[in-house]
């Protein structure tokens, strides 16, 4: 008898709880999967995404080194991450913040589009990062920077400096489009190399993935190529025509490589041995 009473009480409790719970959670308001909240495309985003080139960067003038929205759709100069590479943070502190302030000042004072173009021309560090678009108002089309250097380029001069302080200081005076600054720890990479101007030399980005980039070069003589990609030695491997090739750091933060004369394929691929072995 006690068993039946216990079962009866349990059934009554279950029915009572079920009827009460259904008032608050039923088929009409139960959602099996929470909808994903994404950043809504702005006018600026839509205009930029019409550009189908493989890789370029976007600068949002609204707090670019902390905001996250630009990185959702584009390769952002800020590239938000809570733990930035120290070297990149130092580039921000020593160069990019000042150039950003100059651009913002130009927007505040410019009377013509030519005034703004002059400001972009005076931002070599932003240009070597291939900053093609400037978002000044998300609901307006962005401005295109015609002075961005592109994905990669050849330089006419190499300047070897004594240390890291001299390397970043040199960015205040050189034109990175024509001169590469190299820390003396990489001096052997350019030992014996004599830059020769080759007006017909070309370097193009053929394929882009975050962990693999493929370029084609055509030159009449050996050239020094600088790539608008962050130099990070651990895990990155470089090849020329499928054979291992050396690359090194230039201009404080970028990749550089000596490229032999002729037509060649250059591949950068991220292959960390610890990950592959595991």
Q: Whereabouts are the PLM-identified features?
A:
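Extracytoplasmic/lumenal acceptor-recognition loop(s) of multi-pass membrane glycoenzymes
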Residues: 6-40, 44-128, 144-192, 233, ...
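Generic recognition of flexible, low-complexity loop/linker segments
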Residues: 43-49, 55, 120-133, 201-204, ...
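Active-site-proximal, structured, solvent-exposed surfaces of multi-pass membrane proteins
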Residues: 178, 182-278
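Extended recognition/assembly regions associated with phosphoester-bond processing machinery
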Residues: 113, 131, 138-139
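Alpha-helical transmembrane segments of integral membrane proteins
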Residues: 4-8, 277-278
């Amino acid at each position: 008898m006690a068993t039946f009473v216990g079962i009866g009480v349990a059934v009554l409790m279950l029915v009572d709880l079920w009827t009460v719970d259904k008032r608050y959670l039923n088929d009409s308001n139960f959602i099996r999967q929470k909808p994903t909240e994404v950043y809504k495309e702005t006018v600026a985003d839509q205009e930029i995404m019409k550009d189908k080139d493989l890789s370029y960067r976007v600068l949002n003038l609204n707090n670019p080194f902390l905001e996250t929205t630009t990185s959702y759709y584009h390769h952002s100069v800020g590239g938000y991450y809570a733990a930035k590479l120290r070297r990149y943070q130092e580039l921000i502190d020593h160069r990019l913040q000042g150039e950003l302030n100059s651009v913002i000042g130009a927007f505040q004072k410019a009377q013509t589009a030519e005034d703004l173009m002059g400001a972009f021309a005076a931002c070599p560090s932003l240009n070597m990062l291939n900053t093609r678009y400037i978002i000044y108002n998300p609901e307006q089309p962005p401005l295109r920077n015609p002075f961005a250097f592109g994905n990669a380029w050849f330089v006419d001069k190499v300047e070897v400096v004594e240390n890291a302080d001299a390397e970043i200081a040199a960015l205040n005076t050189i034109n990175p489009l024509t001169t590469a600054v190299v820390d003396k720890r990489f001096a052997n990479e350019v030992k014996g190399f004599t830059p020769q101007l080759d007006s017909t030399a070309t370097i193009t980005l053929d394929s882009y993935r975050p962990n693999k980039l493929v370029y084609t070069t055509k030159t009449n003589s050996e050239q020094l190529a600088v790539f608008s990609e962050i130099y990070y030695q651990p895990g990155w491997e470089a090849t020329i025509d499928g054979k291992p090739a050396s690359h090194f750091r230039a201009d404080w933060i970028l990749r550089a490589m000596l490229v032999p004369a002729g037509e060649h394929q250059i591949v950068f691929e991220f292959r960390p041995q610890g990950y592959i072995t595991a």
